[in-house]
Amino acid sequence: MMNLASIDIGSNGARLLIKRFDPEAIREEDRIKKLMFIRIPLRLGKDVFTLGKVSKEREKMMLHMMKGFKQFMKLNDVEAFRACATSAMRDAENGKKVLKKIEKQTGIKLEIIKGQEEAQLLYNNLVEKTDSNEGSFAYIDVGGGSTEVSIIHDGVLAESYSYNMGTLRMLNGKVTAETEKLFKENLTRYAEQYGDIKIIGSGGNINKLNKLARHSKQDSKNLTLAELKRLYSMMQPLSIEEREISFSLKEDRADVIIPAAEIFLKACEYLKCESIMVPNISLADSIVDGLYEKMMAKTEE
């Protein structure tokens, strides 16, 4: 039995996930238990996609947060952890400098992972959790800074691409016409090349959209295009404050949920899909589960 953790520093939020792994547990549901999950609306992308760097204020906030994460890991007897930063830290001109400072003050080494590795981590976890071995699937993870699209064909990762087209970038008008064109071209080609493709959606926004649609449907793991269009048409005209009240959204979700819905609507159009599978798998899950697999493989050597 071991307690492991993952830290995911995204462009919109930062997450700490602690899980207990017990491969010898009799009941399957006891083999992996979530002990703690914390999400902080850090909003790194707000700085990076406008200033090009992490501001002093955000850096200070990040330091306090990482010190807190360290204490939570101590309290939960975490044996090992992996800490990763994605799109915003990749783009920040002072990203490496900030991470060195954090490591010096907290002892937590944060890795800046490339979009390709991000997609690979998510894909590995997806194969573990879903029956996606036959047919073609487009695994789409929409974050604050980037959107990862991975094509899985008959259980094999066929193609993967990271687009600088995240929700915070869209809100700040930082998505180029070239990126949008490439997204459309690639997804249209996938539809022609791989035929009937099913979309698997990932990220806090699609999870929330699916949850909002859930009360009116039987299938909790599938969000239809009609439901997504209906929710979008209801939310889009509202102000951020009105969305918070009408849909019980937090402030840091009420603004980004609109561009996220737009990305998924475009994906459905280009891939000719009528629904999105939402298995509720996050990058934080993928990181900690990947760490466990790695540790188990070492013990078997």
Where are these regions (language model features)?
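Acidic, divalent-metal-coordinating active-site segment for phosphoryl/phosphodiester hydrolysis
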Residues: 144-151
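Conserved Rossmann-like nucleotide-cofactor binding loop
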Residues: 12-14, 145, 207
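Helical "lid/coupling" subdomains associated with nucleotide-phosphate turnover
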Residues: 18, 47-78, 86-136, 151-301
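N-terminal basic/disordered segments at the start of proteins
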Residues: 2-32
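Conserved ATP-binding subdomain of kinase catalytic cores across diverse folds
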Residues: 27-43, 48, 64-67, 74
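Short glycine-aspartate micro-motif
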Residues: 4-8, 137-141, 199
